[in-house]
Structures are given as C-alpha cells and as structure tokens.
Amino acid sequence: MNAKVISIYAADTSGVCSALYELGGMTVVHDASGCNSTYATHDEPRWYDRKSMIYISALTEADAVMGNDGKFIRDVAKAAGELSPKFIAICGSPMPAMTGFDYSSAAEEIERETGLTTFFVDTNGTHSYLQGAEGAFLNIAKLFCCEGKEKQANSVNIIGATPLDFSVNTSVSSIKKWL
C-alpha cells in the first residue's frame, strides 16, 4: 500500500507556540510533557537567543482521570502572577482532548483570576502546525486588532513568519530588509 498523504513534521501545539513566541504572552500547553519537549528541542531555534514564556502544564495521569481542572487553573494563574505576561494562551494535547477538558471554561476562569486576556487555541496535538498557528493568529487578531487604533506610519505586519516555515534565523530579518 502506498501512502497518499505525507504527515506533517510539527503538531498544532508547535504552531501555537511558534506563532506566539515573540508577543510577550504566556503560552501553556496542557500536556504531560511530550508535545512541548518536541517543540522545545526540535522546532524552535529562537530558544538559543531569545526568552519566551512557553510552558507545559505537567498533566499527571491522576489529574487527567480525576478531572482535576482546578490544579491547571491555579498553576497557570500563579505562574502569570510571577511572570506578568501581556496575555495568556492555552492549548491542548491528546490526553485532555480524550478526557473532554473544557478549555473555554478554564480560559474564562484564568482570566477572571488574573485580570489578563486569556484565550484557548483549539488543538489536540494531532493536527498540522499550520492549524495551530492559524488559530493563534486569529485569536490575536480578534482580541488585539481593534478598529480605531492608531496606525503606525510606514509599517507592515509580517504575519506567519515563524521558524516552522522560515527555518534560517536570518529569514525574517531578510524579509524586513526587503520590505
């Protein structure tokens, strides 16, 4: 049997993390460890020279089975209090997807506790990084690109330029020079 589709090299969670990396927010992947460790060790070259607030929730089997959503909410709120991000983004992996974790409610509760804009990007760790990045960028546009905001003269947004597509670290600076 021949494969008709070649699987993509990075998951939707990597797309979210890559899209939001430089925006000053805190991104939390709700997972035991697998999704974020692959992203951190293979997909993201910016770790070498730039800090970011991308974390894993360290979901345990017991928390997943027993539905200990409060621990996730408390941990994210506590970290946000210590780190002072501009916003909070949460995304998911296979285990919380299988147990039916309610990301919308968790995001609302985290926002209520922290006072920070909090949103979730609908991921489950099994789709393409393109879907994750798209979801992240759409959330940012809906929440932060408002009518009536003053436009910066002679400026342009370079949306979607992440190392997942532009792997050479100088690619984005080359795009900026060209513009």
What are these language model-derived features?
Residues M1-L179:
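An N-terminal assembly and electron-transfer interface module characteristic of large anaerobic redox
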